UniProtKB/Swiss-Prot annotation:
Belongs to the UPRTase family. This is Uracil phosphoribosyltransferase. It catalyses: UMP + diphosphate = 5-phospho-alpha-D-ribose 1-diphosphate + uracil. It is an enzyme of class 2 (transferase). Its cofactor is Mg(2+). Pathway: Pyrimidine metabolism; UMP biosynthesis via salvage pathway; UMP from uracil: step 1/1. Its EC number is 2.4.2.9. Binds 1 Mg(2+) ion per subunit. The magnesium is bound as Mg-PRPP. 5-phospho-alpha-D-ribose 1-diphosphate binds at R79, R104, D133, P134, M135, L136, A137, T138, G139, T140, T141, D203. SUPFAM superfamilies: PRTase-like (SSF53271). Uracil binds at I197, G202, D203, A204. Keywords: Allosteric enzyme, Glycosyltransferase, GTP-binding, Magnesium, Nucleotide-binding, Transferase. It comes from Pyrobaculum arsenaticum (strain DSM 13514 / JCM 11321 / PZ6).
Amino acid sequence: MPVRIIDHVYAQYLLTRLRDKNTGSLDFRKGLVRLGRIIGYELVKTFPFRYVEVETPLGRAVGVDIIGLDKVVIVQILRAAMPLVEGLVKAFPNARLGVVAARRKEEEGYVDVEVFYSKMPSIGVEDTVIVADPMLATGTTMSKAIEEVYKTGTPGRLVVVSVIATPVGISRVLSRWPDTEIYTVAIDPELNDKAFIVPGLGDAGDRAFAT
């Protein structure tokens, strides 16, 4: 399945707190960080592993070695993704980090996105690239970020991480990159005339940084 909904009860609890309009910016940021960590751990479960034997101070034990943790790139879409990526890095502490900065352009009811800054580490076929943005609304911003990834290199695996997605955003991404995996905590049904997710949680960047 290209779309995975994180139905862990604590993830759903955190999402409920984020949706609540009375949640302050500090708790909102903390919630995004915690969700990033949870989603990251769910992603780790999908990595291949092998059994290894290690020597403890008192004997020998069989454990696991996860393969590919040193071949992860996390791309954050500024600025709303910053707390989410902070959590993802807890699960992938050796990840290389990329950044995409984009702005919305609204003209006569039409919403477009302009990338005005992009900086990527090297990307190769052995890498898993995780592109993070709390809100996968129209999919336009995410598509621009993925384009920046492929301008740099072709990853072996591409994963989109969001907190809330919409069918429109999911369809836009998968129609262009059908092998992409999408991890999200919820899928909301609607977009309003400003291209915000309804019911959603509002503007994630503004709420996280009290602007």
